[in-house]
Curated annotation (Swiss-Prot):
Protein name: Large ribosomal subunit protein bL27
Compositionally biased spans, kind Polar residues: 7-19
Keyword Ribonucleoprotein: yes
Keyword Secreted: no
InterPro entries referenced in this protein's UniProt entry, alphabetically: Ribosomal_bL27, Ribosomal_bL27_CS
Family: Belongs to the bacterial ribosomal protein bL27 family.
PROSITE patterns: RIBOSOMAL_L27
Length: 84
């Protein structure tokens, strides 16, 4: 008869790293070309003037300027960058 307990196994103990999504530059902030404005999954916010969209839906500035959040119709949001 065993005089030590067998060690049990657990089905827990895993967790994924946070994705660090969200707005990185807010309205009125000055950005340089290439700065990331929003990291997102899907097009929660659409690219407007002078804003590009990466393959993972990241929005980034294509020119130096000031970030502006706008509406595109009733429900769509967009972000644009205008020269300072």
């Amino acid at each position: 008869m065993a005089h030590k307990k067998g060690t049990g196994s657990t089905r827990n103990g895993r967790d994924s790293n946070a994705q660090r999504l969200g707005v990185k530059r807010y309205g009125g902030e000055v950005v340089r070309a290439g700065n990331i404005i929003i990291r997102q999954r899907g097009t929660k916010v659409h690219p407007g003037n002078n804003v590009g969209r990466g393959s993972d839906d990241t929005l980034f500035a294509t020119i130096d300027g000031i970030v502006t959040f706008e509406r595109k119709g009733k429900s769509r949001k967009k972000v644009s960058v205008y020269p300072a």
